[in-house]
From Swiss-Prot:
The gene is kdsB. It is an enzyme of class 2 (transferase). It catalyses: 3-deoxy-alpha-D-manno-oct-2-ulosonate + CTP = CMP-3-deoxy-beta-D-manno-octulosonate + diphosphate. Belongs to the KdsB family. This is 3-deoxy-manno-octulosonate cytidylyltransferase.
Length: 254
């Protein structure tokens, strides 16, 4: 049985790379609605959209979602979730799953999986998911975050760079994946306990987080363990660019 949890979908209008992204239409619906519909198919007790923009609030109310207006000065989606946890009055041990607002194809099964993994691993302050990288272009793509873990499935680091660097193999060729190196792509879904979210905000960003623009590095920087498992069902990839949007449109509008 999956532990009780709440899904929060952070949705920013003012993305520096792709402004207005949550309201871009796919198959006649705003993208954030598709994410919400997928989250509603999970075992979550509650699904809430969190945004700093009145246009997104209006759109979400139009399709029947619970939506909260948050401050517009948060450093990351996790900082925004901490405000939501306070607004909802969640207990410190309540599990919150952060489903990115640009993942319209997120499988409901992985939402349940990441919540269950956190519940099963009290040594971890966060849980997240990954999948194997089988394409050398993905290894060198900075929009695809790489994750390395220890023997217990706990994250060692996350990076946009091709880590670990296979020194000898990549010196010979960068046109094929090095053999016997288990490269993994991080899937941007997180589970946390509500109490941890408040700690996360109190620490503030660290230089490593700012350098890579990866909020999970703040947790590692402060000694928090992050559990990483291979996703039961890998999502086909989120929408980071207009090209990604067209790819998802082709999948859903075919």
């Amino acid at each position: 049985m999956t532990a009780a949890f709440t899904v929060v979908i952070p949705a920013r209008y003012g993305s520096s790379r792709f402004p207005g992204k949550p309201l871009k239409t796919i198959a006649g619906k705003p993208m954030v609605q598709l994410v919400w519909e997928q989250a509603r198919k999970s075992s979550a007790e509650r699904v809430v959209i969190a945004t700093d923009d009145a246009r997104i609030v209006e759109a979400c109310r139009a399709f029947g979602a619970e939506v909260l207006l948050t401050r517009d000065d948060h450093n990351s989606g996790t900082d925004r979730l901490a405000e939501v946890a306070t607004q909802l009055g969640l207990a410190a041990n309540a599990i919150v799953v952060n489903v990115q607002g640009d993942e319209p194809l997120i499988p409901p099964a992985v939402i349940d999986q990441v919540a269950a993994n956190l519940a099963k691993h009290p040594e971890a302050g966060m849980a997240t998911l990954a999948e194997p990288i089988d394409d050398v272009a993905a290894l060198f793509n900075p929009n695809i975050v790489k994750v390395s873990t220890d023997i217990n499935g706990l994250a060692l680091t996350f990076s946009r760079a091709p880590l670990p660097w296979a020194r000898d193999a990549l010196a010979r060729s960068k046109d094929e994946l090095p053999a016997d190196v288990p490269y993994r792509r991080h899937i941007g879904i997180y589970a946390y306990r509500a109490g941890f979210l408040h700690d996360f905000v109190s620490w503030g960003p660290c230089w490593l987080e700012n350098t890579e623009s990866l909020e999970q590095l703040r947790a590692l920087w402060n000694g928090v363990r992050i559990h990483v498992a291979d996703a039961l069902e890998a999502p086909p990839g989120g929408v980071d660019t207009p090209e990604d949007l067209e790819r998802v449109r082709r999948l859903l509008e075919a």
